[in-house]
Amino acid sequence: MAKVLVLYYSMYGHIETMAHAIAEGANKVDGVEVVIKRVPETMNAEAFLKAGGKTQNAPQATPQELADYDAIIFGTPTRFGNMSGQMRTFLDQTGGLWATGALYGKLASVFSSTGTGGGQEQTITSTWTTLAHHGMVIVPIGYGAQELFDVSAVRGGTPYGATTIAGGDGSRQPSQEELAIARFQGEHVAGLAKKLNG
């Protein structure tokens, strides 16, 4: 049975919501085990809550366990066109996995959120760089989700991966179209994982 990990960092809950949609899509594929985990918070609890951080329910992952999965779908908010510091800190601890080639050939995909739309694609593609150094097989979504063709409203979503626009104050929640794109991404990656490892 192929194993898929949805691994995310979410401060305000947008990426957490997207992660659950990704997992929902992945769970549509029979013969795939789907696990949702988050990377550890690096801010102290007081600063996190003072900044408006939302408590997360998913269990924390450890870098070493990444080797246990056939596919990993990474979710991170955009921080100046890059992944969050929390995700960066987590991935910086995977040097041992790199040294042994533990992630080589495993599938990897990325989804993101941004305040105003700036940097979402750059965040995904800059995250790919780290994953490529591990020899992971990058899985974009292309234009497989029909919602990507809908231009009737402002929304996230790119051929690189699912995204959501949170708004400058974080008040905008992922739209139904954005969640549909996320479900597509999860199903797409899980389907490939099953074909390769099922």
UniProtKB/Swiss-Prot annotation:
The protein's matches in PROSITE patterns, at most eight in alphabetical order, are given as: FLAVODOXIN_LIKE (PS50902)
Cofactor annotation comment: Binds 1 FMN per monomer.
Locate the residues binding NAD(+).
12
Q: Which residues bind substrate?
A: 98
GO molecular-function terms, A-Z:
flavin adenine dinucleotide binding; FMN binding; NAD binding; NADH:ubiquinone reductase (non-electrogenic) activity; NADP binding; NADPH dehydrogenase (quinone) activity
Q: Where does FMN bind?
A: 10-15, 78-80, 113-118, 133
Catalysed reactions listed for this entry = a quinone + NADH + H(+) = a quinol + NAD(+); a quinone + NADPH + H(+) = a quinol + NADP(+)
Q: Which GO terms describe its cellular component?
A: membrane
Q: What is its EC number?
A: 1.6.5.2
Cite a single Pfam family from the UniProt record.
FMN_red
Alphabetically sorted, this entry's keywords are: Flavoprotein, FMN, NAD, NADP, Nucleotide-binding, Oxidoreductase
Q: Which residues form the Flavodoxin-like domain?
A: 4-189
Question: Which cofactor(s) does the record list?
Answer: FMN
Q: Family, per the entry?
A: Belongs to the WrbA family.
Sorted alphabetically, which HAMAP family does this protein's record hold? NQOR
Instruction: Indicate what this protein is called per its UniProt record.
Output: NAD(P)H dehydrogenase (quinone)
| Taxonomic lineage | Bacteria, Pseudomonadati, Pseudomonadota, Gammaproteobacteria, Enterobacterales
